[in-house]
Swiss-Prot record:
Residues 25-76, 88-111 form a propeptide. GO terms for biological process: neuropeptide signaling pathway. One of its GO terms (cellular component) is extracellular region. This is Short neuropeptide F. Keywords: Amidation, Neuropeptide, Secreted, Signal. It is found in: Secreted. Plays a role in controlling food intake and regulating body size. Its main location: secreted. Belongs to the NPY family. Expressed throughout the central nervous system (at protein level). It comes from Camponotus floridanus. The modification Phenylalanine amide is found at F85.
Amino acid sequence: MSAMYAKRCAALVLLVVTVGLVNATENYMDYGEEMAEKTPAENIHELYRLLLQRNTLDNAGFGGIPLEHLMIRKSQRSPSLRLRFGRSGPHVSARALPRPMGAVAGYDDNN
């Protein structure tokens, strides 16, 4: 009796899945008239027009300014007085340095 019940359940599941798949397939007959009246070039122009219209609506809240121009950008670092390789600029005198000019710069001095 349980084997017959399992077969009926399997048949019912198979029937439901089959009906679902058949029902889910699209019927392209509905799109036949719409596709015939426009060429691919016209479809591309229509898509481009819709994208421009959407872009205009997206920027309307900011007075037409694109969002990338409204982003806050980090300011650049202030100019440093140190030159490369740990040397100072010409305005610093040799007497102001804490060590002799010929001394080798340490690891921390090269940052």
